Amino acid sequence: MSSMYHRLRYRPVVAVAAVAGVVLAAAACSSSTSASGGSGTGSGGNVTISVDCAPPAAQQPVQHKEWVEDVATFEKANPNITISSVYNYPCDAVPAQFTAMLRAGTETNLYYTYFTDLPQVLLAGQAANITSYVNSTTVPTLNDIVPSALAAYKAGPSLYGLPTSNYTQGLIYNRQLFTQAGLNPNDPPTTWAQVETDATAIAKLGNGIEGWGDYSAGNNGGWHFSSYIDAVGGSMVNNTTAPPTASFNTPAAQQILQALHTLRFTDKAMSPTQGLAWGTLQQQFAAGKLGMYIAAPDDIYNVIVPTDKGNLDDIGMGPLPSLTGTPAGSLSGGNGFAFSPKDSPAQIKAGIKWLDFESLTPGSGYTFNFERQKADGFPVGFPEPQLFDGATEAKVNQLRSQYATIPVSQYTAFVN
């Protein structure tokens, strides 16, 4: 299976409501490799915009081909707009480089950012206010973009960018181990009580098989704990106080910690070896030695299957476990593009038009052209990104199912 790393990638996370989606990466490209900004408005109303995060031919030949196709299609439909691509892989600069770029003001007209980057971008004064340019005419799917994704590019009522991808976490489970343990592989647990029951049954299979896995090294333990807190309607930080205060020492949080303690020390459903860092659980899961753990869908298509050689047919996803069976939220993350404050009005309009074509229209561009993804050998059908609600999300799901190359029914519990 080909990796979709360039298409869907992320690093920082933010807490969102359960209705919010998932964030992933899309990019832009054309002929130029200059990192400087494009021209404002030339003769005859022509405009050039520079866009970073374009996939280089050397590292990502298929993604590069798709990008070039999209640029050609877009420029043919908009002959007054030229896309000047800046090729970089990976497109997310290390924090020090990103900070240096902002301080120097050397960003492209449209530049790649994570959902968590806006405060730093605004502090550096390197974002154009695009509020007056974005509406349901310039971005027809605008009203269906999940609120949390759009909020990542807002400060008060002002909009400084557009999201292009997102993600959220869920329960990844081994359907084969569920069957072997006498459990229903189409009915993953939704409460911590059910997790305990199912994990214990799986652990009883023996042969080094663990029912539940979790991280506790490399900051990953706190990352998962934050997601568990969100799922029960809590938060790690109370932002209503001045200054904000820690808010994770609650009865609900204590119940979650007690559940993990019971899984580890009473049920013996977790590995006796802890201090696990990211990457360990994926390897264990791919080897058929782990029943369940939480992650985003990209763990499957970027790590478990292509890297650790897991069997795609054995994998299912469900929602994050909660105390009630209905998660109130989840850690989510994503990315999109901000606009340079040096952009002219014509460049802002052209940039919005490009993002609408490339990343915000079902069936179009780099993110949602599932027909082309299938033809180019990429896996199609994973429930990511989930950038929309309403009619737009229904259209995305219809196209995703139409061109699916994976068993999409195994992710129904997660999507619903």
Indicate where each model-derived feature is located.
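Short, solvent-exposed loop/beta-turn-alpha elements that line the ligand-binding surface or hinge
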Residues: 128-145, 188-190, 211-216, 234-255, ...
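C-terminal lobe and pocket-closing loops
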Residues: 298-311, 325-416
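Glycine-centered hinge/linker elements that transmit conformational signals in sensory
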Residues: 196-200, 242-274
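Conserved N-terminal structural module of periplasmic/extracytoplasmic solute-binding proteins
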Residues: 2-120, 136-139, 185, 274, ...
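Hinge/lid segment of periplasmic solute-binding proteins
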Residues: 115-170, 224, 228-231, 314-318
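Short helix-initiation/N-cap motifs at beta->coil->alpha
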Residues: 87-97, 190-196, 273-286
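Extracytoplasmic/periplasmic solute-binding protein
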Residues: 35, 155-164, 169, 179, ...
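Extracytoplasmic/periplasmic substrate-binding proteins
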Residues: 224-227, 231, 258-353
